[in-house]
Amino acid sequence: MNLWQQNYDPAGNIWLSSLIASLPILFFFFALIKLKLKGYVAASWTVAIALAVALLFYKMPVANALASVVYGFFYGLWPIAWIIIAAVFVYKISVKTGQFDIIRSSILSITPDQRLQMLIVGFCFGAFLEGAAGFGAPVAITAALLVGLGFKPLYAAGLCLIVNTAPVAFGAMGIPILVAGQVTGIDSFEIGQMVGRQLPFMTIIVLFWIMAIMDGWRGIKETWPAVVVAGGSFAIAQYLSSNFIGPELPDIISSLVSLLCLTLFLKRWQPVRVFRFGDLGASQVDMTLAHTGYTAGQVLRAWTPFLFLTATVTLWSIPPFKALFASGGALYEWVINIPVPYLDKLVARMPPVVSEATAYAAVFKFDWFSATGTAILFAALLSIVWLKMKPSDAISTFGSTLKELALPIYSIGMVLAFAFISNYSGLSSTLALALAHTGHAFTFFSPFLGWLGVFLTGSDTSSNALFAALQATAAQQIGVSDLLLVAANTTGGVTGKMISPQSIAIACAAVGLVGKESDLFRFTVKHSLIFTCIVGVITTLQAYVLTWMIP
């Protein structure tokens, strides 16, 4: 087949081209906010519209377009859906074996206040999981835990998506930062330093914001000491670790520091009023559980599924383990790489999105052993043995997990199909170039490019792979630091995670809100836009006023 070259301005006017390119995204927003369609229906129609735009407007060859849709769908199944299946399975094992009541009791013994439980589980534990695994696992696990603690499913999912803003940039052992360095040629350590000079401000803001969502101004007044301890310790550790150690460990270090500081603080301090969602009966049951006397051994045993999960995910994430499966590694043959027919290196990305015409690779990687989902499955198997769960119960639990997740898995597949057709057709790059045409105001809009990338792909890593080079080019054109705008792509990207269709589908799957994706999207969308504007203001100030903050 011939090499097809992307054309980012088919209409001959970048604004008109970007308007047509935005049709699938505008439809997706409209479908969830106004039409209130189920997630899988909205995603299916969005793929159809994106495919039509790619074929009719961008003149993408039919074979290339269909191949990108199929590639995206399978990428949604592996590795993304695999992570969700394994994570929900671990949670169900904990519930089925009766251990979750003990976990709930142990958290209630630290604090019965659900605002503070949100800080412990949603923020601290979620940030740790983001640092170790990323790619949807933290929201799935923490949202399920919070539902078990008595949170309403919509609130658990929505709050976890919003609070996940703080750690995403350094997620999965710093992969978003490392990828930004690879595609721009800028030292990834310096990018990490710059992100570490933007995100700590957002961390504090996000935690106060969460308290306001949960309990209004009263919530802020009653919990501010705990928020300052949790957010302040996290922000300081995030700044120090990113600026003096590197981009791989800020989430791991910051989350552990924050968890330790918050737990010790809550032994000395509790809010004057205990805040609980839901009815009085449920609260009374929880308070009874809080006073149930479990031994330290029982509590430790109950937490073992999540301790196993933490251990296996961390092991799978460390560089020596990853190196085994990399090219030239001892176990490289265990990774099955399948070049996608009719797509691999048959589409060329063109300047100014890249410095020179570059063939776009499309290789499906089936890393059956080294995938994060497999690490979580190992934790599940260890838990089954350790908790002496009957094999028949374990099999039926896994079966019910698959049955429950069938529709969400289809949704995730369609969402990734949309992301891939957007990328391979050049649709996403058209939107990026339109933003880059805003001149000196681009410092404000720069984070929106990262936001758009994460909305489209569900991943800060993928957003950086798509747009970091364009950010660097635009920065040079308007005379500001390329390091700053590449970092802004990463920092802005984290604010798009909470409305990314992939994240919405994952969160709904984890808390049993299948078909309610529109409710969750409406819950998070305004917060996402406000946070992106805040990052835009921070970036603009750093570009023109606080230039001393740039490394």
UniProtKB/Swiss-Prot annotation:
Reactions listed under catalytic activity? (S)-lactate(in) + H(+)(in) = (S)-lactate(out) + H(+)(out); (R)-lactate(in) + H(+)(in) = (R)-lactate(out) + H(+)(out); glycolate(in) + H(+)(in) = glycolate(out) + H(+)(out)
Regulation of catalytic or functional activity? Inhibited by the proton ionophore carbonyl cyanide m-chlorophenylhydrazone (CCCP).
Domain of life (superkingdom): Bacteria
Q: What happens when the gene is disrupted?
A: The glcA-lldP double mutant is unable to grow on glycolate and displays undetectable glycolate uptake when grown in the presence of glycolate.
Give compartment(s). Cell inner membrane
Q: Which residues form a coiled coil?
A: none
Q: Which UniProt keywords apply?
A: Cell inner membrane, Cell membrane, Membrane, Symport, Transmembrane, Transmembrane helix, Transport
Pfam families assigned: Lactate_perm (PF02652)
Alphabetically, the GO molecular function entries are: glycolate transmembrane transporter activity; lactate transmembrane transporter activity; solute:proton symporter activity
- The regions listed as transmembrane in this protein's record are 13-33, 37-57, 69-89, 131-151, 159-179, 194-214, 220-240, 244-264, 366-386, 405-425, 438-458, 494-514, 530-550
What's the protein's topology in the membrane?
Multi-pass membrane protein
Induction comment: By L-lactate; aerobically.
Q: Name one GO cellular component term.
A: plasma membrane
GO BP terms: DNA damage response; lactate transmembrane transport
Do you know which PANTHER family this protein is assigned to?
GLYCOLATE PERMEASE GLCA-RELATED, L-LACTATE PERMEASE
Functional summary from the UniProt entry? Uptake of L-lactate across the membrane. Can also transport D-lactate and glycolate. Seems to be driven by a proton motive force.
Q: Which family does it belong to?
A: Belongs to the lactate permease family.
UniProt protein name = L-lactate permease
